[in-house]
Amino acid sequence: MKNMSQRSMDVEKKAANADSCSVSTSSINVDDADVALRFLKQNGLDESSTANEDDVVAGEEANFYGSHELSPKVLRKVDLFILPFLCCTYLLMFLDKALLNYAASMGIKDHLKGNEFSNLGTIFSAAYIFMEPVVTYLIQKFPISKILGTFITVWGIVLACHAACKTYASLMVVRTLLGLFESSSAVGCIAISGMYYTKSEQSARIGFWATQAGTGYIVGGLISFGFLHYHGTAFTSWQIMFLVVGLVTVAFGVLTFLYLPDNVTNAWFLNKEEKIQVVEHIRANQTGLETKKFKKQQVKELFLHDKFTWPMLLLTACSQISTGAIGTFSVTITGTFGFDKYETALLQLPIGAITAMIILITTQMLSRWGHITLITTSMYIPAIIGCIVLISLPLSHKIGNLFSLYLLYSGSCVITNIYIWNSCNTSGYTKRVFRNAITMIVYNVSCIIAPQMFRAYSAPRYIPAKIALLVTQCVCVPLQLYIGYICKKENEKRDKEQEGQERKKYQFLDLTDIENRNFRYIY
């Protein structure tokens, strides 16, 4: 209680400095504040020189849609120069990781025995988990574009090195290295999305780049189908596939290093007036842009004082068991239905279309209407139905089993909504990037556990694994509703606290969502 009281006193000190009615930003320690505040100060602006945006659009509507309208021309410029980097990063991350799945039908399993193929998926996720806290700290301390560009380039080199692998041990080495360097991708994309867009816009834009998971299925299916027709002697078809995609990834990594801006304030494609417009536009998020000062108290708050942390991590773990399962074994499972290797490769294409469609529809609904709790809850229902049918139907029912497998991707796509929840419902830059990090850690724990459920003894039906998928998807429904309920109650509590009071300007002080009582959660 004493620690909480001290934290409250610290917050009040910061809040007093942020009162736009009496104090300008010159009285604020800008080293502790967000980079946006330093940018405004350098350009002769402060909190008191801007309009009272909260008077234009108030409450949760301003918190979600933004209260300072951004010129469509400027928004299009941001989309034109930022979204392609995010989309390509996520596409290559997903594709490069999933190539192992496609290589399963191209002969990579011919010299593997027992659970060695499962272990290749597991070691990738284990390395990802190990590296995630490190890369999160690097993103906090150094320019995000340089970190992303470097990591993408190196993972492209590692991917190309798969072509030289001829033994299980060498494959384990490159899969470990790939996991280490791909750990930068998702957390980096989420952080960048929060710098340029309001919460409503983030829902749509995160949807756009997360849709590339579906595109990855389509591209991967086409690539693997094409390379299946390669019959060289020096290299196998899967080795050539890894080499080509790896070189493409290297080229994109170099472009990212050179041309991706670190944040709004040094975006080379915006002039000074446009940068100010974007900064004012995202003010209502109450999350700011970024700060390079690591704040350990925000990490402590995340783990010890934030009531959303552990329910969200449990939700991530349960919902993404399906992702780990079908991400590594969809080709293998499809093959058990009686399709040959060419048909199996082509049947991955509808998976991409289904994934892209689910993500695009649900995120556009979130962007327009909100209601993330109800929309996300509805996504578990098709997955539950798919699990039940897969358990019940014999393998001879090809079409029924295939359609049921496709239904599982509805639950898998929930990870996009979790990205959105993290980005929109977390304030304090250190806290936000570490929330994204632990989400990705738990995501990869699920990806470690899931392939191990598909044991060789249970082939070809894998009934124990399918039952585990059913149970975890069912658990997600009440858990998702509970998280939405506590978000709603917290907003109501803060509304009651502030009845009849004038709201102070906290937006760019890098306060957390708990410290900043103006902050409202989307649910």
Curated annotation (Swiss-Prot):
Intervals, Cytoplasmic compartment: 1-79, 140-141, 198-207, 261-312, 367-371, 422-432, 488-523
GO biological process: transmembrane transport
Positions of transmembrane segments: 80-100, 119-139, 142-162, 177-197, 208-228, 240-260, 313-333, 346-366, 372-392, 401-421, 433-452, 467-487
GO cellular component, one term: cell periphery
Major localization class: endoplasmic reticulum
Induction: Induced by limited extracellular thiamine levels.
UniProt xrefs under Gene3D superfamilies: MFS general substrate transporter like domains
Pfam families (alphabetical): MFS_1
GO molecular function: transmembrane transporter activity
Keyword field: Cell membrane, Endoplasmic reticulum, Membrane, Transmembrane, Transmembrane helix, Transport
DNA-binding keyword on record: no
Localization: Endoplasmic reticulum membrane; Cell membrane
Family as reported in the entry's similarity comment: Belongs to the major facilitator superfamily. Allantoate permease family.
Protein name: Thiamine pathway transporter THI73
Organism: Saccharomyces cerevisiae (strain ATCC 204508 / S288c) (Baker's yeast)
UniProt lineage: Eukaryota, Fungi, Dikarya, Ascomycota, Saccharomycotina
